[in-house]
């Protein structure tokens, strides 16, 4: 069996879909369906069972046996970069992850987890090294702290001549694609611009969006990376992005091209994002490629075209 936490979320449900397409359906999905809209991400997927996140964590902490587990994809987290309740964030993203990690280490279960490019903050060098990290929000800090916790475990194991089972962290950059309808304000810019045009409006971008550049990565490619590392058993913390920085304006142009209508408009930059907003991200893929992962990443034009064809069908 494979366990996918956050399996009703955007990335988690797409991983389940990718596993199904690979002929795997012995899957336990763990999530919190308090936001009931997320059920839509699961209705077309084949899984063995579903478990609430709190019940799952209780059983993990009790050391319960789930039977043979091939791997755990840990995608479950509070991913709202605008959430400033640090106690809540650290409990959900840090403590929960540590419990699950040690459960896997004790049983030699491969543990593949979601980190984030939010760990980098304002740097212009996006290399998986501590010196380039400095989160701008508590979400990024929670991910940064867990990455550092994993690094300490590796260092301790090395000093004692021990070999840990697989631990693989993925620093997701700006992920977009199908199954993000439930995310509200945290959904991708492509999602919001598409909705605006469908509502008969012009697509709206924040002032300065022609200069804001992010590494926008299509969720289907993210899943390919996850499955490659599952198959090859490589440990480490790796950037998961395209290696390209493209502007929000390029995303808007791709959405307009799909619809063949719409004129890009600008709106004031919101005060609550000032000082906590990454204006530039671009994954350095050196470490990913050195590991042997040869997944090719779609450009914004390619990814948005595929996404909106699915979204608007």
From Swiss-Prot:
Keywords: Carbohydrate metabolism, Isomerase, NADP. Gene3D superfamilies: NAD(P)-binding Rossmann-like Domain, UDP-galactose 4-epimerase, domain 1. One of its GO terms (molecular function) is NADP binding. Pathway: Nucleotide-sugar biosynthesis; ADP-L-glycero-beta-D-manno-heptose biosynthesis; ADP-L-glycero-beta-D-manno-heptose from D-glycero-beta-D-manno-heptose 7-phosphate: step 4/4; Bacterial outer membrane biogenesis; LPS core biosynthesis. It is an enzyme of class 5 (isomerase). It catalyses: ADP-D-glycero-beta-D-manno-heptose = ADP-L-glycero-beta-D-manno-heptose. Substrate binds at residues 174, 185, 192, 206-209, 214, 277. It comes from the Bacteria. NCBIfam families: heptose_epim (TIGR02197), PRK11150.1 (NF008360). This is ADP-L-glycero-D-manno-heptose-6-epimerase. It comes from Vibrio parahaemolyticus serotype O3:K6 (strain RIMD 2210633). The lineage of its organism: Bacteria, Pseudomonadati, Pseudomonadota, Gammaproteobacteria, Vibrionales. The gene is hldD.
